[in-house]
From Swiss-Prot:
<dbReference type="GO" id="GO:0001907">
    <property type="term" value="P:symbiont-mediated killing of host cell"/>
</dbReference>
<dbReference type="GO" id="GO:0030435">
    <property type="term" value="P:sporulation resulting in formation of a cellular spore"/>
</dbReference>
<dbReference type="InterPro" id="IPR038979">
    <property type="entry name" value="Pest_crys"/>
</dbReference>
<dbReference type="InterPro" id="IPR005638">
    <property type="entry name" value="Pest_crys_dom-III"/>
</dbReference>
<keyword id="KW-0614">Plasmid</keyword>
<comment type="similarity">
    <text>Belongs to the delta endotoxin family.</text>
</comment>
<keyword id="KW-0800">Toxin</keyword>
<dbReference type="GO" id="GO:0090729">
    <property type="term" value="F:toxin activity"/>
</dbReference>
<dbReference type="Pfam" id="PF03944">
    <property type="entry name" value="Endotoxin_C"/>
</dbReference>
<dbReference type="InterPro" id="IPR036716">
    <property type="entry name" value="Pest_crys_N_sf"/>
</dbReference>
<dbReference type="InterPro" id="IPR041587">
    <property type="entry name" value="Cry_V"/>
</dbReference>
<dbReference type="Pfam" id="PF21463">
    <property type="entry name" value="Cry1Ac_dom-VII"/>
</dbReference>
<protein>
    <recommendedName>
        <fullName>Pesticidal crystal protein Cry1Ac</fullName>
    </recommendedName>
</protein>
<dbReference type="InterPro" id="IPR036399">
    <property type="entry name" value="Pest_cryst_cen_dom_sf"/>
</dbReference>
<dbReference type="Pfam" id="PF00555">
    <property type="entry name" value="Endotoxin_M"/>
</dbReference>
<dbReference type="InterPro" id="IPR008979">
    <property type="entry name" value="Galactose-bd-like_sf"/>
</dbReference>
<dbReference type="InterPro" id="IPR048645">
    <property type="entry name" value="Cry1Ac-like_dom-VII"/>
</dbReference>
Length: 1178
């Protein structure tokens, strides 16, 4: 047997304190204390007794602050000194130990005073004594802790720094919880609480930074270096990082009751080898690679060990691991083979899942050099046996691979409780076994097979059990399903690794997701769920419990980078409602972001009692109300506080418990009412609560049909509007209002915003110099009520708003500023517009328009606001001035063009009438002349806004003046034409038909009568005035041979007719006063227009248009803005008749009160465009 010493036989911290070890019946009982022992005991205490009170204070005294003297504190310093090979100078060492002794003495006085006060809490003297003792303790710690961070000794002093920091945080938590009962005022308590939350982060980041510095310092290339590196990592995890990981639990307002935490990080005992003292050159990287990469936690079920032999020596050559996911919530899985599958002896299966798992290994090492010269100089460094001991309260037999040994894992990872046998007081259990192996070198053969034992803290339970009386923290790495994500190394202060959920890449099927199994012993307890996370951007996350979504909203960014995380880089979000275990036995987080990743640290389940819930709701309501105002005196609202948010805060206050906080509720109610009044005062919109539409459009809302006003529901507290879809884009559903010029300030940016419950194809416009446009699609959230014990209906049928939409991020930009069609992640929308100079005479104002022009479109929106955002400065000011100048230049050009067009149009209109009273048409005025004049009237640009044609434009007055006269002309013309449906626009209505005829619509959009057969006849009886004169005017076209005839006659004689033929020479008929000239001549005279009368222009609601969202583009273009719906206001661009149509007239004087108009032909086809019988003027 080789006498080379085993380096594991003398671990530095054991050598420092030289403890006595007694072996009683195979059990190890420590009678001495090392820094590792003390730290493990403290961690156990913090994990199990983290409740404010005398029990906690006295517990710290019993574990460390009441029993330590100079030698024990010196042991903490020596431990790290030896690990990093750096000795602290005598002055700094003595100063640190003296400070620690002073703190210990002072804390014992503090603890005794606390015990006496807790026994008689109303005693004024004891209350005053506690105030004195707290101030003394806090001052001493504030002064002492910087002395444990002496320059150049930050690493050697790190473990005592953390002990002092832990003490300071516990004292600050005491005053946060008990300060009011001690007699401190609220301001002092709040100030100390702020110190507490600030120092949690400061102490944490300091400890992790110098831990990493020390770890980097001890790294080296060889096996000896790695042993020291691993020892530093393992021991400072136990003495520093584990304690730091529990610092956040000192936040007494976030964790007001007992909190159950779990440490999922793994530590590693050294490779179980003899002669592992540095002869293995350059092996440190290989050893480190043999450790598992970050992973979801699993449960070690069994180890199947294979045996090989070399020259008669049997050894552990390889193994396979069988494991289960946490909670045994899935099938068992097998890891790839570690090492080699030797067959020198039968494989042996070690069952790890007995009792509480394997807590201890006793290994036998083997080192041999069979030959010592030449190429046969061989080294065999292996393990030839191990005993696996189970954690249990009974004497459960150990499992043994080949034989037990003397290399004890408890020498490196001691128990956390030395007052009981190690099988009960153990601190860690075996979680995995990997292997370091090495092959051949240049001059010798080296066989190295070193199993690497990984250990996890016993607080990381097999199942995720949710306590009914404590806040339960479940690390995300205890999940059993991870999709599009990864497990990453923890930063050192989280107690384990983290889960990163990747972005979906805008593919909803690829959203990162982590799922965690949970178990509830109590089925009646209600819980809220809180998640600790880190993100560099505002990110939309969804939390599901079972099949129900309990949280879905955008949470704010917490970090500037996800690399080198600091404690301040993590934030929390929480479900607003409480739920029972009936929702299911899984909880998960899904990343809805298409572009950003998120890191999930842990889930927290907070049990809700009536008192706790009332306190939570009151605190939440107070924070929400105070956050509305710019200052504590409530003089003004924050700009980013929306009207919708105020309503939701009001809901929070409304549903506070009258039983627990009636006075506070009344006070908060007055504050939120004041906030609502301030919101109304700054809102420039009239009737923002939608009391009525179209009552006074000039002073409120105007709108179309298809709009309904609905009362509040579980989303909206006040009235909101619903806009439905439309079957014709020329008749959209719309809602509009004008912001009067008198309400606007010069050179100021204004913002339109509101809340959209859901929408499809909702177009939003702000119009001043141009149209700022946004198309918004907001998917509906469905019911706001996931499966829960609460009902969405109140006892009187009113909506229950106990779960308002308060997950609100004021920093989130909810708008698509470039005018593109987009789906908002948020239901909040905003659109801004800049105002340049103001002119009350011009009264340009700002038009606000909501419009839907598709069949599938719809929208539900409310809490609309138009408010001042900020004065314009710098580039924004220059931009609006430039935009206004361009607008005015084009406006001047438009005025010049309008004067010319108006003059021409007016002349055309005036020519239709006899006089300026416009009450009588000229005798020769025909329908073509009226349409030609109408076309010229419609050539006036900017009569109405293209975005919504019910809104008048700059030329509305002159357009309506002339258009009114056109309507008068049509009316007068109708009055003197006694034939009904003479243009066949209504088919054959009013006409009698014999035989087969058709009414066809030509390509020029004209309806014509087609008589294809000689035996067909179309007629109409017309009443006339005997003795008066009439003009029969017909426009028609003859195809083929024969003649087309339009006859007028009475019962007896008095017959006349107009004949049409496909002839070249002009025909003269008796009494015919007009020759058969080509009709296009008349068209040219009147501009080629022949437009029909249609709906009145007031019925035309809209125009599709494409508008950029910057001022310089498309404000007033030089050409006419295209408007395919313009004919719906009374104008349709009739093209001239094709060549061949002629118009003929004859005079007729009836002798009776009835005449007949008959249309027929002799052969071929006769096409009639119009028939008119006009009463002559007297």
């Amino acid at each position: 047997m080789d006498n080379n010493p085993n380096i594991n036989e003398c671990i530095p911290y054991n050598c420092l304190s030289n403890p006595e070890v007694e072996v009683l019946g195979g059990e190890r009982i420590e009678t001495g204390y090392t820094p590792i022992d003390i730290s493990l005991s403290l961690t156990q205490f913090l994990l199990s007794e983290f409740v404010p009170g005398a029990g906690f204070v006295l517990g710290l005294v019993d574990i460390i602050w009441g029993i330590f003297g100079p030698s024990q504190w010196d042991a903490f310093l020596v431990q790290i000194e030896q690990l990093i090979n750096q000795r602290i100078e005598e002055f700094a060492r003595n100063q640190a130990i003296s400070r620690l002794e002073g703190l210990s003495n002072l804390y014992q006085i503090y603890a005794e005073s606390f015990r006496e006060w807790e026994a008689d809490p109303t005693n004024p003297a004891l209350r005053e004594e506690m105030r004195i003792q707290f101030n003394d303790m806090n001052s001493a710690l504030t002064t002492a802790i910087p002395l444990f961070a002496v320059q150049n000794y930050q690493v050697p002093l790190l473990s005592v720094y953390v002990q002092a920091a832990n003490l300071h945080l516990s004292v600050l938590r005491d005053v946060s919880v008990f300060g009011q009962r001690w007699g401190f005022d609220a301001a002092t308590i709040n100030s100390r609480y702020n110190d507490l939350t600030r120092l949690i982060g400061n102490y944490t980041d300091y400890a992790v930074r110098w831990y990493n510095t020390g770890l980097e310092r001890v790294w080296g290339p060889d096996s000896r270096d790695w042993v020291r590196y691993n020892q530093f990592r393992r021991e400072l995890t136990l003495t520093v990082l584990d304690i730091v990981a529990l610092f956040p639990n000192y936040d007494s307002r976030r964790y007001p009751i007992r909190t159950v935490s779990q440490l999922t990080r793994e530590i590693y005992t050294n490779p179980v080898l003899e002669n592992f003292d540095g002869s293995f050159r350059g092996s440190a990287q290989g050893i480190e690679r043999s450790i598992r990469s970050p992973h979801l936690m699993d449960i070690l079920n069994s180890i199947t060990i294979y045996t090989d032999a070399h020259r008669g020596y049997y050894y552990w050559s390889g193994h396979q691991i069988m494991a289960s996911p946490v909670g045994f919530s899935g099938p068992e899985f097998t890891f790839p083979l570690y090492g080699t599958m030797g067959n020198a002896a039968p494989q042996q299966r070690i069952v790890a899942q007995l009792g509480q798992g394997v807590y201890r290994t006793l290994s036998s090492t083997l080192y041999r050099r069979p030959f010592n010269i030449g190429i046969n100089n061989q080294q065999l460094s292996v393990l030839d046996g191990t005993e696996f001991a189970y954690g249990t309260s009974s004497n459960l037999p150990s499992a043994v691979y080949r034989k037990s040994g003397t290399v004890d894992s408890l020498d490196e990872i001691p128990p956390q409780n030395n007052n009981v046998p190690p099988r009960q007081g153990f601190s860690h259990r075996l979680s995995h076994v990997s292997m370091f192996r090495s092959g051949f070198s240049n001059s010798s053969v080296s066989i190295i097979r070193a199993p690497m034992f990984s250990w996890i803290h016993r607080s990381a339970e097999f199942n995720n059990i949710i306590a009914s009386d404590s806040i339960t923290q479940i690390p995300a790495v205890k999940g059993n399903f991870l999709f599009n994500g990864s497990v990453i190394s923890g930063p050192g202060f989280t107690g384990g690794d983290l889960v990163r959920l990747n972005s979906s890449g805008n593919n909803i099927q690829n959203r990162g997701y982590i799922e965690v199994p949970i178990h509830f012993p109590s089925t009646s307890t209600r819980y809220r769920v809180r998640v600790r996370y880190a993100s560099v951007t505002p990110i939309h996350l969804n939390v599901n419990w079972g099949n129900s979504s309990i949280f879905s909203n955008t949470v704010p960014a917490t970090a500037t980078s996800l690399d080198n995380l600091q404690s301040s880089d993590f934030g929390y979000f929480e479900s607003a409602n409480a739920f029972t275990s009936s929702l299911g036995n899984i909880v998960g987080v899904r990343n809805f972001s298409g572009t950003a990743g998120v890191i999930i640290d842990r889930f927290e389940f907070i049990p809700v009692t009536a008192t706790l819930e009332a306190e939570y709701n009151l605190e939440r309501a107070q924070k929400a109300v105070n956050a509305l105002f710019t200052s504590t005196n409530q003089l003004g609202l924050k700009t980013n506080v929306t009207d919708y948010h105020i309503d939701q805060v009001s809901n929070l206050v409304t549903y506070l418990s009258d039983e627990f906080c009636l006075d506070e509720k009344r006070e908060l109610s007055e504050k939120v009412k004041h906030a609502k009044r301030l919101s109304d005062e700054r809102n420039l919109l009239q009737d923002s609560n939608f009391k009525d539409i179209n009552r006074q459009p000039e002073r409120g809302w105007g709108g179309s049909t298809g709009i309904t006003i609905q009362g509040g529901d579980d989303v909206f507290k006040e009235n909101y509007v619903t806009l439905s879809g439309t079957f014709d884009e020329c008749y959209p559903t719309y809602l509009y209002q004008k912001i009067d010029e008198s309400k606007l300030k010069a050179f100021t940016r204004y913002q339109l915003r509101g809340y959209i419950e859901d929408s499809q194809d909702l177009e939003i416009y702000l119009i001043r110099y141009n149209a700022k446009h946004e198309t918004v699609n907001v998917p509906g959230t469905g019911s706001l009520w996931p499966l829960s014990a609460q009902s969405p209906i109140g006892k009187c049928g009113e909506p229950n708003r106990c779960a308002p939409h308060l997950e609100w991020n004021p920093d989130l930009d909810c708008s698509c500023r470039d005018g593109e069609k987009c789906a908002h992640h948020s239901h909040h929308f905003s659109l801004d517009i800049d105002v340049g100079c103001t002119d009350l005479n011009e009264d340009l104002g700002v038009w606000v328009i909501f419009k839907i022009k598709t069949q599938d479109g719809h929208a539900r929106l409310g809490n609309l606001e138009f408010l001042e955002e900020k004065p314009l400065v710098g580039e924004a000011l220059a931009r609006v001035k430039r935009a206004e100048k361009k607008w005015r230049d084009k406006r001047e050009k438009l005025e010049w063009e309008t004067n010319i067009v108006y003059k021409e149009a007016k002349e055309s209109v005036d020519a239709l009438f006899v006089n300026s009273q416009y009450d009588q048409l000229q005798a020769d005025t025909n329908i073509a002349m009226i349409h030609a004049a109408d076309k010229r009237v419609h050539s006036i640009r900017e009569a109405y806004l293209p975005e919504l044609s019910v809104i008048p434009g700059v030329n509305a007055a002159i357009f309506e003046e002339l258009e009114g006269r056109i309507f008068t002309a049509f009316s007068l013309y109708d009055a003197r034409n006694v034939i009904k449906n003479g243009d066949f626009n209504n088919g054959l209505s009013c006409w009698n038909v014999k035989g087969h005829v058709d009414v066809e619509e030509q390509n020029n959009q004209r309806s014509v009568l087609v008589v294809p057969e000689w035996e067909a006849e179309v007629s109409q009886e017309v009443r006339v005035c005997p003795g008066r004169g009439y003009i029969l005017r017909v426009t028609a076209y003859k195809e083929g041979y024969g003649e087309g005839c339009v006859t007028i006659h009475e019962i007896e004689n008095n017959t006349d007719e107009l004949k049409f033929s496909n002839c070249v020479e002009e025909e003269i008929y008796p009494n015919n006063t007009v020759t058969c000239n080509d009709y296009t001549v008349n068209q040219e005279e009147y501009g080629g227009a022949y437009t029909s009368r249609n709906r009145g222009y007031n019925e035309a609601p809209s125009v599709p248009a494409d508008y950029a969202s910057v001022y310089e583009e498309k404000s007033y273009t030089d050409g006419r803005r295209e408007n395919p719906c313009e004919f719906n206001r009374g104008y349709r661009d009739y093209t001239p008749l094709p060549v061949g149509y002629v118009t003929k007239e004859l005079e007729y004087f009836p002798e009776t009160d009835k005449v007949w108009i008959e249309i027929g032909e002799t052969e071929g086809t006769f096409i009639v465009d119009s028939v008119e019988l006009l009463l002559m003027e007297e």
